[in-house]
């Protein structure tokens, strides 16, 4: 049963929410789970408030938002802490946030095919199919977002062990995409996030490569 706490501390609660969403969906929706919810599953985080899911298109995002609304979630605009992210509508209930993206995560940093294929686990909840993002892609997303709690999450991911070559490949591929310079501001967020980790005596092997 989903508790009334403003944070989720049991992975079963997340699965229950996905089961309920899947029951309300009239069409199949696939999404990438990328954030604290995956870290909770991996035992790298004690609790999470935000459940971050990235759909592949606007249509699937709208379907998922409609299912959340049918479950009693309120659909609201993003908060200040989401200002770096490409999320436009949140589903909120009991102090918890279901942050639903449609492809774009931050400016022109979006859900790549590589991120989709690197998913570590695929689960079906009725009409909702959830892929768990890799730790490396969660790390990148949290460096960019820099919401309260994201910095310690990044530290925990580094300590758990990351494939920094994979991290760099994804960052480089996203940065080299054709696009306006102003849409590449997310690379500055990553650089700042890495600097903060290094200031806390964590070794980030790709730090020099990211420095602009």
Cite the ranges covered by each PLM segment:
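Compositionally biased terminal segments of proteins
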Residues: 1-212
């Amino acid at each position: 049963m989903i508790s009334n706490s403003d944070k989720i501390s049991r992975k079963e609660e997340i699965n229950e929410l996905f089961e309920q969403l899947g029951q309300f969906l009239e069409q199949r929706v696939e999404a990438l789970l990328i954030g604290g919810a995956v870290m909770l599953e991996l035992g790298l985080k004690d609790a999470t408030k935000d459940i971050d899911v990235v759909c592949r298109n606007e249509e699937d995002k709208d379907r998922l938002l409609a299912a959340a609304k049918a479950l009693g979630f309120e659909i609201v605009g993003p908060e200040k802490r989401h200002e770096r992210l490409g999320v436009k509508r949140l589903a909120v209930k009991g102090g918890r946030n279901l942050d639903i993206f449609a492809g774009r995560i931050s400016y022109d940093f979006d859900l790549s095919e590589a991120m989709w294929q690197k998913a570590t686990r695929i689960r079906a909840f009725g009409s909702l199919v959830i892929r768990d993002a890799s730790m490396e892609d969660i790390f990148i997303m949290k460096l960019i977002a820099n919401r309260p709690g994201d910095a310690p999450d990044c530290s925990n991911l580094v300590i758990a062990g990351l494939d920094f070559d994979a991290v760099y490949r994804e960052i480089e591929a996203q940065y080299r995409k054709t696009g306006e310079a102003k849409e590449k501001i997310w690379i500055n967020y990553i650089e700042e996030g890495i600097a903060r980790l290094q200031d806390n005596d964590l070794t980030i092997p790709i730090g020099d490569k990211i420095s602009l």
